[in-house]
């Protein structure tokens, strides 16, 4: 650390301590009887969640419905043709938020009956790819496509048969590998309870 940086750091520390001391020793004038002080913070919800459709503004994502652990999320548009996806937050064994997945329907006739976007942490080992296993079915492997400041993304396609397995299944296990521990893997449980109704709702909304 250079002397200049040390001096700046010390000055900042002293300034902070002085500010705290002043705040502790300066008395706030009492409010008049029956009046509410105007400098009080009433607090706010740290996790306000998504707005409803009526509360959302154009181009804002809103929560349309819940299906067990699945959320139907849509983007409000000016013409009312709000595109929707089926979203689930994935947790590790300790209950920490690790990744997220959003599924959506695709036009009939293509190789993929449904698509999905999976986002993993930036600390993920990309060359290890993403694997998905639905119940006891054969494991499938998917590469990561790109990374943003928020995380690394894999773009997935599911055949009609694979989509049917999701609808009939109990859970899927999505596995990623940490870059800091390439000899270990992280298994994320994706509950499929509510998936069928949720995917039907998304498909119906996107068909409008």
Say what each PLM segment does.
Residues 1-25:
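Sec-dependent N-terminal signal peptides
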Residues 4, 24-208:
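A generic "folded-domain core" signal
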